[in-house]
From Swiss-Prot:
Its EC number is 4.1.1.11. Substrate binds at residues 57, 73-75. Keywords: Autocatalytic cleavage, Cytoplasm, Decarboxylase, Lyase, Pantothenate biosynthesis, Pyruvate, Schiff base, Zymogen. Pathway: Cofactor biosynthesis; (R)-pantothenate biosynthesis; beta-alanine from L-aspartate: step 1/1. Coiled coil: none annotated. Is synthesized initially as an inactive proenzyme, which is activated by self-cleavage at a specific serine bond to produce a beta-subunit with a hydroxyl group at its C-terminus and an alpha-subunit with a pyruvoyl group at its N-terminus. The modification Pyruvic acid (Ser) is found at residue 25. The gene is panD. GO terms for cellular component: cytosol. Its cofactor is pyruvate. This is Aspartate 1-decarboxylase.
């Protein structure tokens, strides 16, 4: 059996560009793509923390080191500059890989979309 699992996440990145008339996609700083293990043309889901919008598109390379998160085409209507978004990619993982210790790549960024940390799991949520 295979399970649809979180593979990659860029957490709380700020939208830097909204390009309505650019061919659809999301341009992401190449440093962030590599850190999160997202490849060009891979399907991504984007969740807007500010307004609750959730949508899918595909990733393209943004200028390395720029902090770019550019929503292009119709995706540009789903956010405003400065909105915080979570960018996620999923993969089908078989039971053997899961039992062998497969883990996702989670990337956390600062207010300039520079990497401030990473980890391979989502912590257990507690009632506090």
């Amino acid at each position: 059996m295979q399970r649809h699992m979180l593979k990659s996440k860029i957490h709380r990145a700020a939208v830097t560009h909204c390009e309505l008339h650019y061919e659809g996609s999301c341009a992401i700083d190449e440093d962030l793509l590599e850190a999160a293990n997202i490849v060009e043309n891979e399907r991504i889901d984007i969740w807007n923390v500010n307004n609750g919008e959730r949508f899918s598109t595909y990733a393209i390379k943004g200028e390395r080191g720029s902090g770019m998160i550019s929503l292009n085409g119709s995706a540009a209507r789903r956010a405003q500059l400065g909105d915080l978004v979570i960018i996620a990619a999923f993969a089908m993982i078989d039971e053997q890989e899961l039992k062998a210790g497969w883990k996702p790549d989670l990337v956390f960024v600062d207010e300039d979309n520079k990497i401030k940390g990473s980890r391979d799991h989502v912590p257990t949520q507690n009632w506090t």
